[in-house]
Swiss-Prot record:
UDP-N-acetyl-alpha-D-glucosamine binds at residues 8-11, 22, 73, 78-79, 100-102, 137, 151, 166, 224, 330, 348, 363, 374. The keyword Nucleus does not apply. Its EC number is 2.7.7.23, 2.3.1.157. It comes from Shewanella sp. (strain MR-4). Residues 1-226 are annotated as: Pyrophosphorylase. It comes from the Bacteria. In the N-terminal section; belongs to the N-acetylglucosamine-1-phosphate uridyltransferase family. In the C-terminal section; belongs to the transferase hexapeptide repeat family. Binds 1 Mg(2+) ion per subunit. The lineage of its organism: Bacteria, Pseudomonadati, Pseudomonadota, Gammaproteobacteria, Alteromonadales. It catalyses: alpha-D-glucosamine 1-phosphate + acetyl-CoA = N-acetyl-alpha-D-glucosamine 1-phosphate + CoA + H(+); N-acetyl-alpha-D-glucosamine 1-phosphate + UTP + H(+) = UDP-N-acetyl-alpha-D-glucosamine + diphosphate. Residues 227-247 are annotated as: Linker. Acetyl-CoA binds at residues 377, 383-384, 402, 420, 437. It holds the Pfam family NTP_transf_3. This is Bifunctional protein GlmU.
């Protein structure tokens, strides 16, 4: 029995006041619908039917080449009509799970519980109890058993008093779903084909209907405007921050952190305020991350320190390495064990060896730097000739004086010393001292220019 997921994503989202289709608005730098797609994959879906309508080109461009079946809903005539567009790709023996592209916080564990609650040949619907259920369809029960769902505009006074509401998420047998969708009518206050009407049909056909509930109501909330989108963003961030704390991170203020990807942390990790994580970030034990740092697709080893306002992207920090404040590691950069870069040092496709240091104001690009090297302030590897990038090699225990330019390709041998202000254009041998600056001149009695009075 295959799990066939139908995701409804055809709406325009007029209240968003945007040209972007509603489901493409982001939560944690990922579109709402992509969150739903990822969750569907995580529970082992065999197929995903994406029902789309408004903004088709933008939707297809944003979602790219994914394992999706695109099912067009040319007219938005209700949720039942939307699901019906997926019928050509649904087999009789499928379990059909219906999800919504603007409900991004639904968790895999909740969907697994819903699927487990579905009886053989029966239906399972996800419900939640709200203090204020206004606007939602109500779950109608008789003697504890679900007999139907009534929408807000069609409900009588007794039904409006019901607090258990329909989330719209349900698991339905494929063959029965086809039959029930074929019976739908739009004879209601909205003039639409309600998916919810299939529940009364299931009851009338003697089909068993079970329910499940999420761990939190926020899982099933959608975003119809930017205020609700911001609320979902905060809820998502709170949930992700909680995961980090449970895993061993000490967050200085859990409400002032942004997690926009997959973060793995070790024990006793300290994270100060306003830190941003993006992509896949792996952090070891006893790591300290200062305020305002940005970590993107990087690996941080045990006991490393990232000082405030540093940007670490596509890079690695070794054991007890440190960066910052105001340092930038670009893709391909790596600090080996005990290596350090300080304020306003930038590295790209460069390795700084064990115990080596670049304390201030340097650019190290396309460079292999050995152990025990000191990089003076203002040092630049001149790696680009206007057409191609070239490699700088600095071997172990080299001392590079301040304001030195290394014009690549060039190799500096072990133990060499480069005098401050030098421009190095040729290879330097081991233990050599190289000074290329112009000889210092002393002009006695020099008279400074005097300003001319006007």
């Amino acid at each position: 029995m295959a799990l066939n997921v139908v995701i409804l994503a055809a709406g325009k989202g007029t209240r968003m006041r945007s040209d972007l289709p509603k489901v493409l608005h982001p939560i944690a730098h990922k579109s709402m619908v992509q969150h739903v797609i990822d969750t569907a994959h995580s529970i082992g879906s065999d197929a995903i039917q994406l029902v789309y309508g408004y903004g088709a080109d933008k939707l297809k461009s944003a979602l790219g080449e994914q394992q999706l079946n695109w099912m067009l809903q040319a007219e938005q005539l209700g949720t039942g009509h939307a699901v019906a567009q997926a019928i050509p790709n649904i087999d009789d023996n499928d379990t059909v799970l219906i999800l919504y592209g603007d409900v991004p916080l639904i968790q895999a564990s909740t969907l697994e519980a819903l699927l487990a609650a579905r009886p053989d040949h029966g239906v399972a619907i996800l419900t939640v109890n709200l203090v204020n259920p206004t606007g939602y369809g109500r779950i109608v029960r008789e003697q504890g058993k679900v007999v139907g769902i009534v929408e807000q505009k069609d409900a009588n006074a007794e039904q409006l008093a019901i607090n258990e509401i329909n989330t719209g998420i349900m698991a339905v047998p494929g063959k029965a779903l086809k039959t029930w969708l074929g019976r739908l009518s739009n004879n209601n206050a909205q003039g639409e084909y309600y998916l919810t009407d299939i529940i009364a049909m299931a009851h009338a056909d003697g089909v068993e209907i079970n329910t499940a509930q999420p761990q939190s109501a926020i899982e099933v909330e959608g975003a119809n405007n930017r205020v609700q989108l911001a609320q979902l963003e905060r809820a998502y961030q709170a949930r992700e921050a909680e995961k980090l704390m449970i895993a061993g991170a000490n967050l200085r203020d859990p409400s002032r952190i942004d997690i926009r990807g997959e973060v793995t942390v070790g024990m006793d990790v300290m994270v100060d305020v306003n830190v941003i994580f993006e992509g896949k970030v792996v952090i070891g034990n006893n790591v300290s991350i200062g305020a305002g740092a940005i970590l993107i697709d990087c690996e941080i080893a045990d006991n490393a320190e990232i000082k405030p306002y540093s940007i670490i992207e596509g890079a690695k920090l070794g054991v007890a390495a440190s960066a910052g404040p105001f340092a930038r590691l670009r893709p391909g950069a790596e600090l080996m064990q005990d290596a350090h870069i300080g304020n306003f040092v930038e590295m790209k496709k460069a390795v700084l060896g064990v115990g080596s240091k670049a304390g201030h104001l340097a650019y190290l690009g396309d460079a292999q730097i050995g152990a025990g090297v000191n990089i003076g302030a203002g040092t630049i590897t001149c790696n680009y000739d206007g057409a191609n990038k070239h490699l700088t090699v600095i071997e172990d225990n080299v001392f590079v004086g301040s304001d030195t330019q290394l014009v690549a390709p060039v190799t500096i041998g072990k133990g060499a010393t480069l005098g401050a202000g030098s421009t190095i254009t040729r290879d330097v041998g081991e233990d050599e001292l190289v000074i290329t600056r112009v000889k210092q001149k002393h002009l006695t009695g020099w008279q400074r220019p005097v300003k001319i009075k006007k």
